[in-house]
Amino acid sequence: MAKIERQKRIYRKRIPYGMQNFEDVMERDCYYVDKTPFIEKIEESNMYFFFIRPRRFGKSLTLSMLENYYDINKKDKFESLFGKLYIGENPTPERNSYLILHLNFAMISAGLDNYKKGLDAHCNNKFNSFCSRYAHLLPPHTKEEMNQKEDAVAQLGFLCDKCAEAGLKIYLFIDEYDHFTNQILAHKEHEKRYREQTHGEGYLRHFFDTIKGAAGDSLGRVFVTGVSPVTMDDLTSGFNIGTNYSLSPEFNEMVGFTEEEVRQMLAYYASVLPFRHSVDELIEVMKPWYDNYCFSEEKYGNTTMYNSVMVLYFVDNYIRNDYDIPKKLVETNIRIDYDKIRMLIRHDKEFAHDASIIQDIVTRGFTTGTLMENFPAERINDPDNFLSLLFYFGMVTIDGTYQGNTRFVVPNEVVRDQMYTYLLDTYKEDDLTFEQYDKTQLESKLAYEGAFKPYFAYIADCLKRFSSQRDKQKGEAYVHGFTLAMTSQCKFYRPISELDNDGGYADIFLLPLCDIYKDIEDSYIVELKYCKPGTSDEQLKHLFEEASAQIRRYANSDIVHKSVKTTKLHQLVVIYRGAEMAMCEEVE
């Protein structure tokens, strides 16, 4: 029998995809992008630090890093955890000098009607763990006496008093402090209960009052994170000693990865593994999907951020996929909670039909407004507040200025995919669902047989059946937005709206994903036109000729020729007369 040769395992650092415990990351020799230089900046900042970023952006690992750095119980592990990092060579005065208390409000399962019970249960669990870990430092019987207190507010106050008595300092971390806020945003009927919790004698307000009362004494530092500033504003007068650093330029790069950090990671793995693509080639694939977040207006034009979770997802799958580009570029868990998206859609639909912010972004490719640092829940329907909420959720990002206002765009294809997917909900009434029409087969024939008419006829039929009278009033904006949303569902293409090139603007360019579908044969550039229901056939013909001339110019641009690669480019003119497609023709 022939001897089976075992391939020698290549050593490489683990990819910390999905890991949120800093100690595990370091002890298991994972690749860690060094964010410890920010420890110095945090220590020089206000002792009560608020920081907002989109979900699944690396916040939890950053908190874990800080906890391990400041934990008085981890003194003996300082060298093993931080010795090879920046802060290991540049330690700060406060290292390993705090008792760490970590609360995660996402772990509170109770709703607003019994939020006190849920908060009490979570805090009691964390407070008991705290007392056990630091029993050798706390006064005798602290744990037993703490458990005799009636609720979380009383227990927190008691622990702060005991630490003050012993000359100890607590570093309090609160992760997802605004988790329960999603209920009020997603379900309007909860607004009254939310206000009761966050105003006046509300329990959550009382909890933050207790934190405020311990400030400057036993509660040495507080670090609060979440995804929305809404609750922060409603709690402001109860906790008015904190500083919101979410939009500060010095902390723009604290979570997420810069392109240089992504390149360094790829270069490392390419040096120890048989990569089939260069770093530049991988960046070309990743950048449109994961990059382009800017969290500070002062940083625009200098540094954009990649979603770190998505980068790790891509690298992990690229390696597991035998060094081929993964077909699935969007991690399932990255999708924003469905209820939250429904909330955004609900609020957006409450605007006048000509003032829909999401529609504006889809139609023009951008929107403008003023970025608000915080705002109360009851004023979420103010346009600037709603736009700012989209920003904090990661649905739009800063893209410079326009006519004196901040310009916002969809940051990348991961977000665009989510926005267009859920935007379809705004075009459906009573939660109707699209019939499939064997949509998968239509998409395959579009990509491999050049059969565009059945595909665009399918879109036109869906548009006609699911559009309300209010949608029809939007005219061209509605047709354009609906078509974009539908084409975004096709896995073979990345639809780009109003492609900016040297020949002008094309309405939609279906950029073929050749790196994933190497045998794809067809690509499309589409000029969408809209005319009113009463438009004559003669006027329609004139509109077609006008669109044909435009699309020929677009198709000859360098950017289109580069993107289509080996596929056949189809130049299409699609004209809607009202809500019905009147023409779908290829221009030779």
Located regions from the model:
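Structural recognition of the conserved hydrophobic beta-strand(s) that form the central parallel beta-sheet
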Residues: 172-175, 205-206, 220-227
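Domain-level recognition of nuclease-like catalytic cores that cleave nucleotide substrates
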Residues: 559-588
